[in-house]
Amino acid sequence: MSTSSAQYSPDLVRAYLQEIGRVRLLTAEEELCFGRQVQRLMMLLDAQTELRDRLGHEPSKEEWAAAVDLNLEDLDRQIEQGQRAKRKMIEANLRLVVSIAKKYQKRHMEFLDLIQEGTLGLERGVEKFDPSKGYKFSTYAYWWIRQAITRAIAQQSRTIRLPIHITEKLNKLKKTQRELSQQLGRSATASELAEVLELPLEQVREYIQMNRQPVSLDVKVGDSQDTELQELLEDEQSSPSDYVEQESLRRDLRNLMAELTPQQQAVIALRYGLDEGDSLSLAKVGERLNISRERVRKLERQAMDHLRRRSRLLAEYAAS
């Protein structure tokens, strides 16, 4: 069976990693400012979409400006600011994409393909980020990046045959992705692909989605090939906000772990993913520590009872 993943040379991968390593990280103030500018851009784009639906045709720039109560100069300025801010936030967080993609390096997808998928997730995270909620962007973006990568892995093997005209469009998309990646020194965003291909952004995203192919959830992934894909996929009920709250819990727990017994520390670390980033089930923790599932449950309860008594900081988590 052929694969849709491109074959990338080690030199290309190395050049990409060197290129993104030169990008300066954003300060907290820049993150806040850029986040607000992107929010404004997304509001303007939403208004344009609503206007298009209402009018039944593509609105003129004048109609768009009037709908958002701006003159043409201010509309252009805010669009340009938002696009620049979005680009800056993406470029400054590409190292985060790489660090997450490394966790999923295996035979099913090329490393740069994983990075490409993660970059698309990062782009969505930038678009959805609300700086007023006080989240650190990298924590919020982690959820979007990991979701994009794991879903791409889950859809890697095709179960249906696509029409030839769709396949041709997907091949053109893939070629453009590779060319842009080489020109930019990084993965191309959906917006950049849409501009080069002269296609609507949503259509490009639809083609990207079509280009992903499903595999069995029983497939083994990870460095040691001992983890099933279904263990890596996000809970459908989870959300970026849930993930940020879980990260806050992890941080608070680390500050109190010293008060627990070594065995309690091990249970809490594995259950909440304090060391490896992924939470394990009671059964998996039991296997790691060579103790029963019920013993794990008891140790976790004892540890959480102690932590609850010791700090009001955990009250909202322990109550949930």
UniProtKB/Swiss-Prot annotation:
The keyword Lyase does not apply. InterPro entries: RNA_pol_sigma-70_dom, RNA_pol_sigma70, RNA_pol_sigma70_r1_2, RNA_pol_sigma70_r2, RNA_pol_sigma70_r3, RNA_pol_sigma70_r4, RNA_pol_sigma_r2, RNA_pol_sigma_r3/r4-like. A motif (Interaction with polymerase core subunit RpoC) lies at residues 113-116. CDD domains: Sigma70_r4. It is found in: Cytoplasm. Its main location: cytoplasm. Residues 282-301 bind DNA. GO terms for molecular function: DNA binding; sigma factor activity. Residues 89-159 are annotated as: Sigma-70 factor domain-2. GO terms for biological process: DNA-templated transcription initiation. Residues 256-310 are annotated as: Sigma-70 factor domain-4. Sigma factors are initiation factors that promote the attachment of RNA polymerase to specific initiation sites and are then released. This sigma factor is a component of the biological clock pathway that affects the circadian expression of a subset of genes in this bacterium. This is RNA polymerase sigma factor SigA2.
